[in-house]
Swiss-Prot record:
Its cofactor is FAD. This is Monooxygenase 3. The gene is MO3. Expressed in seeds, seedlings, roots, leaves, flowers, pollen and siliques. Keywords: Monooxygenase, Oxidoreductase. One of its GO terms (molecular function) is FAD binding. Monomer. Pfam families: FAD_binding_3. SUPFAM superfamilies: FAD/NAD(P)-binding domain (SSF51905). It comes from Arabidopsis thaliana (Mouse-ear cress). It comes from the Eukaryota. InterPro entries: FAD-bd, FAD/NAD-bd_sf, MOase. Belongs to the 3-hydroxybenzoate 6-hydroxylase family. Its EC number is 1.14.13.-.
Length: 406
């Protein structure tokens, strides 16, 4: 089968990083297509907390004001051990922009990103199965037999990235923990307030977060169990057992959660040392989002850093494409290829150490918060709980910049 007409940029995966990259390119006047294997946008994970770095990325993409209308701003955190005993510690946020945190349903965020793209940008039911070299181009083979030809290939296809494997990445490593997530809806409103409640200890870390007046997102991470992820009734009972010492208003959130909204998945991450020598970009191919830096959710930076990726990648590609247009239509193909390659190398260089930092910090925070050891527990509960909460905010103090330096 012959390839369809040549595309400038193909992005694989319509998740946060893929859509952010496509929207960034669109804002710069550069067309791309996004290949999504599912029949519609996927919203795995239910909700995510958006920190300072995410807001800077969304400002660059032109969607920040709309997203602000979708979630209440946090007033602060309440942190305490999951077992009865020590009193809770509270951290109130200043009103400055560095401390703006909101929890937004993932589907609403994806819809907002996709809604800003030109019609036809996203091609659903388009599963990548093979990548083939063709001179300075890449031939993208889909499961239905379609072949697409592209000048740039961007892998935003998640933890099991086909593009990542082509670049030489190994599969992410499973931790000894699983995450159980859910979302509760209250027709007459909930009483959680606008604070992020966190509980930890005894091998457990859990959180309860208001998205809006009627919706609460919650999660619980725990050492791996033999629970069947399809048996939602047993999963719900398991979580209720783990939070039995928490206040009644917290337990009522779980009791209100519909069984259909429960999901359980193993936590995975990319060993940070792999990024020291890995090819984040090679030739005219690169990866972003979970395809680049899968991490545990302990500092809430998976989705936020994916938006950073999208803005920075769009800027680097935009600089390369704009330079091409300035030289005119007769530009040598080799020169165009070299400039795109240099742009992707620039992107890779800017994301390597940021990714290593976030992966390492997230894994370490999760290890400390879920520790069962006597001395580690004492040290954490007495001295570390406030510091770990502060660290979550500190790691979000990153500004990806604007889409264009002009």
């Amino acid at each position: 089968m012959e390839a369809e007409s040549t595309q400038d940029i193909i992005i694989v995966g319509a998740g946060i990083s893929g859509l952010a990259t496509a929207l960034g390119l669109h804002r710069l006047g550069i067309r791309s297509i996004v290949l999504e294997s599912s029949e519609q946008l996927r919203a795995t994970g239910f909700a995510l907390s958006l920190y300072f770095n995410a807001w800077k990325a969304m400002e660059a993409l032109g969607i920040s004001q709309h997203i602000r209308s979708l979630g209440d701003r946090f007033q602060g955190w309440v942190v305490r051990p999951i077992s009865a005993g020590d009193p809770p510690k509270e951290m109130l946020f200043p009103e400055s922009e560095e401390y703006e945190v909101r929890c937004v349903q993932r589907k609403l965020l994806l819809d907002a990103l996709a809604g800003e793209l030109p019609q036809g940008t996203i091609r659903f039911s388009s599963k990548l199965v093979h990548i083939e070299l063709s001179g300075h181009y890449k031939m993208v083979h889909l499961s239905d037999g379609t072949i697409l030809k592209t000048k740039v290939l961007v892998g935003c296809d998640g933890v099991k990235s086909v593009v990542g494997k082509w670049l030489g990445f190994k599969n992410p490593v499973k931790t000894s923990r699983v995450a159980i997530r859910g979302i509760a809806h209250f027709q007459t409103g909930h009483e959680l307030g606008r604070r992020f409640f966190q509980f930890y200890g005894n091998g457990v870390r859990s959180g309860f977060i208001s998205c809006d007046q009627n919706t609460v997102y919650w999660f619980l991470t725990h050492t791996s169990t033999d629970l069947d992820k399809k048996n939602h009734q047993k999963i719900k009972q398991f979580v209720l057992t783990k939070i039995k010492d928490l206040p009644d208003n917290i337990k009522s959130i779980l009791e209100t959660t519909d069984l259909d909204s429960l999901v359980m998945n193993p936590l995975m991450y990319r060993p940070p040392w792999e990024l020291l020598w890995a090819n984040i970009a090679k030739d005219n191919v690169c990866v972003a989002g979970d395809a680049l830096h899968p991490m545990t959710p302990d500092i809430g930076q998976g989705g936020c850093s994916a938006m950073e990726d999208g803005v920075i990648l769009a800027r680097c590609l935009g600089e390369a494409m704009k330079a091409k247009n300035m030289k005119g239509e007769t530009e040598d193909e080799n020169e165009s290829y070299r400039r795109i390659e240099d742009g992707l190398k620039k992107y890779a260089g800017s994301r390597k150490w940021r990714s290593i930092d976030l992966i390492t910090t997230s894994y370490t925070v999760g290890f400390i918060q879920q520790s069962r050891g006597k001395w580690m527990t004492l040290f954490r509960d007495k001295f570390m709980s406030s510091f770990l909460s502060w660290l979550r905010v500190k790691k979000s103090h990153f500004n990806c910049g604007r889409l264009s330096h002009e």
